[in-house]
Curated annotation (Swiss-Prot):
Name assigned to this protein: Microtubule-associated protein 1 light chain 3 gamma
Keywords: Autophagy, Cytoplasm, Cytoplasmic vesicle, Cytoskeleton, Lipoprotein, Membrane, Microtubule, Phosphoprotein, Ubl conjugation pathway
Gene: MAP1LC3C
Site (Cleavage): G126, C127
InterPro entries: Atg8-like, MAP1A/MAP1B_LC3C, Ubiquitin-like_domsf
Functional note: Ubiquitin-like modifier that plays a crucial role in antibacterial autophagy (xenophagy) through the selective binding of CALCOCO2. Recruits all ATG8 family members to infecting bacteria such as S.typhimurium. May also play a role in aggrephagy, the macroautophagic degradation of ubiquitinated and aggregated proteins.
Oligomeric and partner information: 3 different light chains, LC1 (a cleavage product of MAP1B), LC2 (a cleavage product of MAP1A) and LC3 (produced by one of the MAP1LC3 genes), can associate with the MAP1A or MAP1B heavy chains. Interacts with TP53INP1 and TP53INP2. Interacts with CALCOCO2. Interacts with TECPR2. Interacts with TBC1D5. Found in a complex with UBQLN1 and UBQLN2. Interacts with UBQLN4 (via STI1 1 and 2 domains). Interacts with UBQLN1 in the presence of UBQLN4. Interacts with TRIM5. Interacts with ATG13. Interacts with MEFV and TRIM21.
Species: Homo sapiens
Any GO BP annotation: autophagosome maturation
Tissues expressing this chain: Most abundant in placenta, lung and ovary.
Similarity field: Belongs to the ATG8 family.
GO MF: phosphatidylethanolamine binding; ubiquitin protein ligase binding
Lineage of the organism: Eukaryota, Metazoa, Chordata, Craniata, Vertebrata
């Protein structure tokens, strides 16, 4: 009989651990692995098409590009080539696919030291507007009017 599958927690990572604990965790990671970037990748709360990842925390080389990281996430979700998804930084920014993780860390790291990314399918947004708000609001703040 196979072992039971681990079901990802429903609560976001930031709500599961205090700021101090997260900062301590990042400090330990960065001290031990100075060339790695601590990244938390979570499914958009209203996502229904894409599967949950088996883990949320990733330690990635700083020279890795977003294209390469996207490929890693895609393979962990076991998506077909025709299945597309967005990977948003801080729940609101689509970043350049040629950007390195070091650049993303420099520009988008949270106060706790993690970089937070959210993935969602195009179907989740359900409208023709750009997925990334240009006004600085997060996706939850934007109404999406049906056609």
């Amino acid at each position: 009989m196979p072992p039971p599958q681990k079901i990802p927690s429903v609560r976001p990572f930031k709500q599961r651990k205090s700021l101090a604990i997260r900062q301590e965790e990042v400090a330990g990671i960065r001290a031990k692995f100075p060339n790695k970037i601590p990244v938390v990748v979570e499914r958009y709360p209203r996502e229904t098409f894409l599967p949950p990842l088996d883990k949320t925390k990733f330690l990635v080389p700083q020279e890795l590009t977003m294209t390469q990281f996207l490929s890693i996430i895609r393979s962990r979700m076991v998506l077909r080539a025709t299945e597309a998804f967005y990977l948003l930084v801080n729940n609101k920014s689509l970043v350049s696919m040629s950007a390195t993780m070091a650049e993303i860390y420099r520009d988008y790291k949270d106060e706790d030291g993690f970089v937070y990314m959210t993935y969602a399918s195009q179907e989740t947004f359900g409208c023709l507007e750009s997925a990334a708000p240009r006004d600085g609001s997060s996706l939850e703040d934007r109404p999406c009017n049906p056609l």
